[in-house]
Design a protein with these regions (language model features):
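Ribokinase/PfkB-type carbohydrate-kinase core domain
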Residues: 1-129, 133, 163, 190-194, ...
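Conserved post-catalytic alpha-helical subdomain immediately downstream of the catalytic base
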Residues: 108, 135-206
Length: 210
């Protein structure tokens, strides 16, 4: 929509009854350190495998409508990192607390995309709200994929570069905001050099936390 809002329609076809080759999946996962899950029904069968292998587990709960939706329970239970969009909630605090009550990991980290309002970072200790960032000369064209890039930017910074939570949130927001400035396509993703250029510029005027 012109105001940046969106409505996505998903055709899952046979994903509810698909039976993955668990041995093959385990072999692939054994070579990994992080497993990022979306909500495909068959992928829930890989959650205990990833946990047993000691992988960090990240789950994208997408646009939550019902905070007590049983379909998402397994993904919430196994996750070390949880991402979701707050498009259906003006204040995500109640959703965050509900998720925390269903997950026993003391180090659980929750990241919430709030579109033009920014994003939220929640730990067991506190919930922090971050205002959105502005990438000059990069107007918003298409918001599809922004949530995915928020996750990619945050996880790669926090897990693989061992950066702080706040720096990782900024990198995630840069990736998400840049994605909104191009038509949705895997050929237009932000590069490492572009990310670093925006990072250095924004470090001069860091995003504000509320």
């Amino acid at each position: 929509y012109p105001d940046g809002n969106r409505k996505n329609f998903y055709d899952g076809k046979g994903h509810m009854d698909l039976e993955p080759d668990l041995n093959l999946c385990k072999s692939i996962l054994s070579k990994s350190t992080l497993a990022h899950f979306n909500l495909m029904n068959w992928s829930r069968k890989l959650l205990p495998i990833a946990k047993d292998l000691g992988l960090k587990i990240s789950c994208d709960l997408q646009d939550i409508v019902d905070i007590n939706d049983p379909y998402r329970e397994d993904f919430i239970k196994f996750a070390d990192f949880i991402f979701f969009s707050t498009v259906n909630f003006s204040d995500p605090s109640s959703v965050i607390k509900n998720i925390q009550s269903k997950n026993s990991n003391p180090d659980l980290i929750i990241i919430v995309g709030m579109g033009k309002k920014g994003c939220v970072l929640a730990t067991r200790e506190k919930i922090s709200f971050y205002k959105s960032i502005d990438l000059k000369k990069h107007p918003i064209i298409d918001t599809n994929g922004a949530g995915d890039e928020l996750a990619v930017g945050f996880l790669s910074s926090f897990l693989f570069q061992k950066d702080s939570l706040e720096n990782s949130i900024m990198r995630g927001q840069i990736c998400a905001r840049y994605t909104c400035s191009v038509k949705a396509s895997t050929s237009n993703l932000i590069t490492k050099n572009e990310l670093e250029t925006f990072w250095k510029e924004l470090r001069k005027n860091p995003i504000k936390k509320e």
